[in-house]
């Protein structure tokens, strides 16, 4: 972070900036993985009572989560999920890697976060281009995998596992992705998932939402007084970093981000 803020992060060649070239030798400052690591590396050490419920409620547009002590809170990055059962898909699919997984146990809850920085939400995945009649974007894949991982699909198992509350959030420089609104409708969500009739129930609606980077910095600024002095120092550094990353995008594409 300090390297970038002090202008030592280097720059991208044009093919790399457009996403046409990937360099395996270095993680570029423009990588969304770098932003993910900085953002959630900081949030991990802040008191979750003062940021987690407000962040989720902002994403969902409703007061669904309350301030509380979070038992067994875990924030994990780039977590691989179980391979989705082949018999429930019309295409081959490998393991899904979720950018951020937040979980706690009172009540049992799992949050998937899909992070984006310099690229758009992918319209297709590696083995699914949508030709089988189902949407193939990253958001619906994460929704499908998350619902199964948290017990919302009916499966012919010897033992039934208890359901966990589930939330899926798209975190990008700007809000307004139409897929978020589309998949918030239960009927549309079911028709977008193979064997959607197995979804006999769904988490409390809405459970799919979105955040912008500015939502995050605004929330941390508003809640800053509730944190300890060391936490405030971390918040100030993170807010400066995210503002810097938004400025980089603005310079690259000629418009701002809200």
Walk through the language-model features, giving the residues of each:
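Charged, terminal alpha-helix-loop-beta segments
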Residues: 1-258
């Amino acid at each position: 972070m300090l390297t970038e803020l002090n202008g030592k992060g280097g720059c991208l060649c044009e093919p790399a900036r457009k996403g046409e070239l990937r360099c395996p030798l270095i993680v570029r400052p423009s990588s969304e993985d770098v932003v993910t690591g900085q953002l959630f590396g900081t949030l991990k050490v802040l008191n979750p009572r003062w940021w987690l419920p407000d962040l989720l409620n902002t994403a969902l547009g409703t007061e669904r989560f309350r301030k509380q002590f979070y038992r067994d809170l875990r924030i994990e990055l780039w977590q691989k999920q179980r391979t989705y059962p082949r018999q429930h898909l019309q295409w081959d699919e490998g393991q899904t890697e979720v950018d951020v997984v937040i979980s706690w146990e009172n009540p049992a809850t799992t949050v998937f976060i899909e992070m984006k920085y310099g690229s758009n939400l992918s319209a297709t995945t590696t083995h699914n281009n949508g030709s089988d009649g189902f949407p193939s974007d990253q958001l619906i894949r994460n929704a499908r995998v998350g619902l199964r991982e948290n017990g919302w699909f009916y499966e012919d198992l010897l033992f039934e596992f208890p359901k966990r509350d589930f939330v899926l959030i798209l975190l990008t420089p700007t809000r307004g992705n139409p897929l978020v609104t589309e998949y918030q409708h239960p009927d549309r969500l079911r028709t977008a998932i193979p064997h959607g009739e197995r979804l006999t129930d769904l988490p409390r609606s809405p459970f799919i939402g979105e955040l912008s980077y500015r939502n995050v910095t605004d929330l941390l600024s508003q809640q800053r007084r509730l944190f300890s002095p060391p936490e405030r120092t971390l918040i100030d550094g993170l807010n400066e970093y995210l503002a810097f990353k938004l400025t980089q995008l603005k310079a690259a594409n000629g418009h701002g981000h809200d």
